[in-house]
């Protein structure tokens, strides 16, 4: 594997063990060129997934993009990163088990919303505000009212 520090094409595996949730193999590596140490994760990929965007454009499913979007929603919240990782693993498993190679981005978004709702209400609302493209405070009020998360009426904003 290429060293992320110096770009050398080979590295040595110094330690290998399953991750805590058993969904990946964690490997500690050493670059013989620069001495840099880094960690890699190896995961099973059942099939290549393609996400169909709202615009109709297609792009390969990017697990790290999913992790980043959820991490942004949970930032500065009392949510354990391991719970986020388990949640992402569950969403990926659901996507792969659907048997489809092309999935609409809305399916991914709805799965994330459902998972975040059970994880943290604030993270759920943060994610929804981007996913549902809230433009005004009234959009938040309508969403919170529909979800039963608030008694705020539109005229109180």
Swiss-Prot record:
Keyword Heme attributed: no
Alphabetical list of InterPro entries matching this protein: ATP-cone_dom, NrdR-like_N, RNR_NrdR-like
Matching PROSITE patterns: ATP_CONE
Pfam families named among the record's database cross-references: ATP-cone, Zn_ribbon_NrdR
ATP-cone domain ranges (all copies): 49-139
Superkingdom of the source species: Bacteria
Zn finger intervals (unnamed): 3-34
Cofactor note: Binds 1 zinc ion.
GO MF annotations in UniProt: ATP binding; DNA binding; zinc ion binding
GO annotation terms (biological process): negative regulation of DNA-templated transcription
Cofactor section: Zn(2+)
Keywords: ATP-binding, DNA-binding, Metal-binding, Nucleotide-binding, Repressor, Transcription, Transcription regulation, Zinc, Zinc-finger
Family to which this protein belongs: Belongs to the NrdR family.
Its job: Negatively regulates transcription of bacterial ribonucleotide reductase nrd genes and operons by binding to NrdR-boxes.
Alphabetized PANTHER family for the sequence: TRANSCRIPTIONAL REPRESSOR NRDR
Protein name: Transcriptional repressor NrdR
Taxonomic lineage from the root: Bacteria, Pseudomonadati, Pseudomonadota, Alphaproteobacteria, Caulobacterales
């Amino acid at each position: 594997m290429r060293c992320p520090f110096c770009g050398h094409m080979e590295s040595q595996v110094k330690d290998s063990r399953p991750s805590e949730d058993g969904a990946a193999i964690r490997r500690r590596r050493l670059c013989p060129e620069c001495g840099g140490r880094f960690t890699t994760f190896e995961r099973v990929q059942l099939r290549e997934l393609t996400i169909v965007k709202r615009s109709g454009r297609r792009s390969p499913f990017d697990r790290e993009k999913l992790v980043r979007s959820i991490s942004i929603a949970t930032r500065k919240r009392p949510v354990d990163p391991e719970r986020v990782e388990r949640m992402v693993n569950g969403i990926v498993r659901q996507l792969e088990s659907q048997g489809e190679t092309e999935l609409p981005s809305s399916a991914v978004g709805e799965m994330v919303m459902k998972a975040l709702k059970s994880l943290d209400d604030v993270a759920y609302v943060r994610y929804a505000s981007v996913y549902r493209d809230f433009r005004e405070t009234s959009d938040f009020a309508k969403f919170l009212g529909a979800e039963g998360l608030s008694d705020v009426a539109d005229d109180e904003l």
